[in-house]
């Protein structure tokens, strides 16, 4: 009997190819055209997206990308490639591919790369610790569309999420402790997760609960009193209500009431990107300090740390 050959597909959101208005416009058009991300009726959404949002947001977002761009490209791509390479180095007999829901390398190119390596089985690991229809659901949908066009379909194992996985929590706790050792223990550890529209949660998306699961386990692992940890949501977009409390408003409130030392961790981001390096590490730092806060530190994402790669090994082990 022929032994099954397994490959691993690491999936993430994606990034513009360059910090330019045109590249950002292409990326945002693909991203904001996904019904999993924005489910506004198309007759209403297309004119708004193409006539207002893309022309206005693309130049502004491009400038933000320029402020964090690295020699090797966008931070998300640099760190994602490092994750892929580090995992592949630990699994020399297992092909590891990287695919993005939007932009390049695409999920389809990652599937094709693995099939070209003659794999019979693909383990799909979306690098979103907390499930949401707008992230993990989008990977699932695109994977189905890709495979629907193939004559040869491999076996698929799909890891839905890992919000309360022990190795993930341990990696976060180690990162937080290292930050505490460097900057001192904060008055408040703020855990900022990417937001989603409140309506998505009302309609059944269990993302808020999975964020609470991560927060509960991390607080326990760190041994912090609950009153020293807050959970908030960032990166809201549009006018409808999103999950609350909002990160920026919470930081302003904490600064105004005299909280001196804040450290912020973003447990939902597997790799640093625009939303962490610019929005959290820069914009929200200014909000807190201008409101009266004294000390602010951003705790980096897990990126390609050994503990993060150990977690990927553990999560994929049952399927290899």
From Swiss-Prot:
InterPro entries: Ferrochelatase, Ferrochelatase_AS, Ferrochelatase_C, Ferrochelatase_N. The keyword Cytoplasm applies. One of its GO terms (biological process) is heme biosynthetic process. It is found in: Cytoplasm. One of its GO terms (cellular component) is cytoplasm. Its main location: cytoplasm. It catalyses: heme b + 2 H(+) = protoporphyrin IX + Fe(2+). Keywords: Cytoplasm, Heme biosynthesis, Iron, Lyase, Metal-binding, Porphyrin biosynthesis. One of its GO terms (molecular function) is metal ion binding. Monomer. Belongs to the ferrochelatase family. Catalyzes the ferrous insertion into protoporphyrin IX. HAMAP family: Ferrochelatase (MF_00323). This is Ferrochelatase.
């Amino acid at each position: 009997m022929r032994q099954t050959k397994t490959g691993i597909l690491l999936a993430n959101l994606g990034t513009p190819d360059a910090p330019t208005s045109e590249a950002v416009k292409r990326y945002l058009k693909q991203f904001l055209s996904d019904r999993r991300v924005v489910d506004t009726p198309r007759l209403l959404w297309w004119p708004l997206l193409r006539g207002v949002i893309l022309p206005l947001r693309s130049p502004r977002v491009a400038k933000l990308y320029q402020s964090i761009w690295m020699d090797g490209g966008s931070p998300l791509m640099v760190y994602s490639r490092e994750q892929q390479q580090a995992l592949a180095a630990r699994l020399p007999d297992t092909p590891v591919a990287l695919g993005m829901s939007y932009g390049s390398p695409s999920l389809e190119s990652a599937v094709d790369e693995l099939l070209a390596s003659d794999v019979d089985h693909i383990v799909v690991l979306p690098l979103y610790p907390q499930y949401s229809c707008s992230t993990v659901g989008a990977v699932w949908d695109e994977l189905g569309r890709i495979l629907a066009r193939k004559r040869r379909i491999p076996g698929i194992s799909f890891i839905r999420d890992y919000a309360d996985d022990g190795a993930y929590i341990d990696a976060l706790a180690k990162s937080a402790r290292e930050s505490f050792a460097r900057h001192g223990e904060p008055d408040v550890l703020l855990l900022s997760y990417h937001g989603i529209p409140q309506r998505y949660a009302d309609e059944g998306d269990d993302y808020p609960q999975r964020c609470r699961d991560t927060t509960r386990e991390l607080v326990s692992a760190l041994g912090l009193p609950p009153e020293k940890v807050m959970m908030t949501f960032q990166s809201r977009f549009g006018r409808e209500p999103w999950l609350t409390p909002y990160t920026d408003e919470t930081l302003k409130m904490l600064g105004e009431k005299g909280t001196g030392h804040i450290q912020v961790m973003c447990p939902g981001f597997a790799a640093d990107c625009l939303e962490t390096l610019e929005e959290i590490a820069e914009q929200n730092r200014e909000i807190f300090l201008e409101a009266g806060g004294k000390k602010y530190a951003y705790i980096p994402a897990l990126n390609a740390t050994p503990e993060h790669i150990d977690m990927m090994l553990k999560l994929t082990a049952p399927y290899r």
